Design a protein with these regions (language model features):
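Bacterial N-terminal signal peptides that target proteins for export
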Residues: 1-11
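C-terminal motif of bacterial Sec signal peptides marking the signal peptidase cleavage site
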Residues: 18-23
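N-terminal ligand-binding lobe of clamshell/alpha-beta domains
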Residues: 25-26, 58-438
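Bacterial lipoprotein signal-peptidase II cleavage site
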Residues: 24-35
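Residue-identity detector for glycine
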Residues: 3-5, 30-32, 44
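Post-signal peptide N-terminal segment of mature Sec-exported envelope proteins
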Residues: 33-60, 65-74
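Hydrophobic helical h-region of N-terminal Sec-dependent signal peptides
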Residues: 13-17
């Protein structure tokens, strides 16, 4: 029989085992295993914003999926502050009189030097269904337009090719005139009776026709004072979107104005693709022309009543000649406007010019040129038959597609010019706008 000491030792061992078992069974998880933390990811996650909460309610968040493309029709249904509603943006590279900046739900379009008064305009294009900003500081006096617009009257044919090529002629409800249009898809709309003619703002304006078109915007341009020319639209409460494309002095600068109407319909992606292709082809042609062995001399225009309007060396026409690998004889005339010289002065400087381009409206033959002034026949280019006019595509109303499609597609004009000045570089060229006078 065990003694008292043995009994005490046995009780101590049992107590120790009980304490050890209790210690091993005590766990905060109850099962002895930790729950792993949920992984987090920021890749491709939607925009989240915190919903308003009070001190007595639990905080909640609402997941908002930001748009990945611009809304080209309709309005935002549920506006959320902080969401970028213009994920597809554009930049202006070549046009000096057009600019655009973006905020989350509106864009600011600025037009400068729109006429001889150097008129400037600011447009705040607000995504429909979102709040307009306060027009303070540099936005004071801006014209606010909800975009995308669904209807417009276009009072400049230079905008038509771009709208046609991005497939958005659906917004065009009227033109100032049907007479001078060349774009085939627009001619189809005219033939179908789908458009109204409003007359120009400065001559023959038809207020009833303009009102009947119910345009969100009227795209136009200015020659005279802005206050006078835009008054008819202001009287109808129709916003005027003023283009300054014809004030640009480079071919690509003018062509890039196709982006102007596209900004009003949120078609940044489509018009950027179109313009980038044009600019790339134009650049390739400039490089091609630069490989020519010689740079022929070029004369422009003609005399009227013994006076020759000589284009400046910084003009649109002069830039075309330079890019085509030619030397414009009057490149030393400063600026982009013309200088008036008498025909004898021009003869003295340019009688031996290699080529004579753009003698102008109403000159269909060498005979017409000589009839306008017999001294025209004294130029060597006339004697050789190296006189070319840009009137190959003129309609029955004397609308010249050179000023429509040619403005939107300067690469086509440049291709013609290279084929004239450097035929060895384009032996199989088919002319689009130019023809040799006979």
């Amino acid at each position: 029989m065990p003694g008292p000491g043995s009994t005490l030792r046995l009780l101590a061992a049992v107590l120790a085992l009980a304490l050890l078992a209790a210690a091993c069974g005590d766990s905060s998880g109850g099962a002895g295993t930790a729950t792993p933390a949920s992984p987090s990811s920021t890749s491709g996650s939607p925009t989240t914003v915190a919903a308003p909460s009070s001190s007595t309610e639990p905080s909640t968040t609402t997941t908002v999926v930001a748009p990945t493309v611009n809304l080209t029709e309709g309005c935002v249904e549920n506006y959320t502050e902080g969401v970028d509603y213009f994920p597809q943006k554009l930049t202006v590279e070549d046009a000096e009189r057009l600019g655009v900046t973006y905020e989350d739900n509106y864009k600011v379009v600025r037009v400068s030097d729109a006429n001889f008064e150097e008129a400037a305009f600011t447009y705040v294009l607000v995504q429909c269904g979102t709040p307009a900003p306060e027009l303070t500081d540099d936005l004071a006096g801006a014209t606010v337009v909800e975009v995308p617009i669904s209807s417009a009257v276009v009072m400049s044919t230079t905008m038509l090719p771009g709208l046609a090529e991005i497939g958005r002629l659906d917004i065009v409800k009227g033109l100032d005139s049907f007479d001078y249009v060349s774009t085939p898809a627009v001619l189809d709309l005219i033939e179908a009776g789908d458009l109204v003619a409003t007359g120009s703002l400065s001559f023959g304006f038809d207020a009833e026709a303009m009102a009947a078109a119910e345009p969100d915007v009227a795209f136009t341009f200015l020659f005279g004072p802005a206050a006078d020319e835009l008054a008819p639209l202001e009287g109808l409460g129709i916003p005027a979107a003023v283009s300054a494309d014809y004030r640009e002095n480079t071919p690509l600068g003018r062509a890039e104005w196709m982006k102007f109407p596209a900004l009003f319909i949120n078609e940044e992606a489509a018009v950027t693709d179109l313009y980038d292709g044009i600019a790339t082809e134009y650049g390739d042609l400039v490089e091609k022309a630069a490989t020519a062995a010689e740079r022929p001399t070029v004369l422009l225009d003609k005399a009227t009543d013994g006076v020759w309007n000589v284009a400046g060396g910084g003009s649109y026409a002069a830039r075309f000649i330079a890019d085509a690998g030619g030397d414009y004889i009057f490149s030393d005339v400063e600026g982009n406007s013309s200088e008036q010289l008498d025909i004898e002065t021009v003869l003295e400087r340019a009688s031996d010019a290699d080529f004579w381009l753009n003698p102008g409206f109403g000159v269909s033959s060498l005979m017409d040129l000589e009839a306008a002034d017999p001294r025209h026949a004294k130029f060597a280019a006339f004697e050789r038959g190296d006189v070319w006019n840009n009137d190959l595509r003129v309609n029955a109303n004397f609308g010249n597609d050179y000023f429509e499609t040619g403005a939107a597609h300067p690469e086509l004009v440049l291709g013609d010019l290279i084929a004239i000045l450097h035929p060895e570089l384009a032996p199989d060229h088919e002319f689009v706008f130019y023809r040799r006078l006979q």
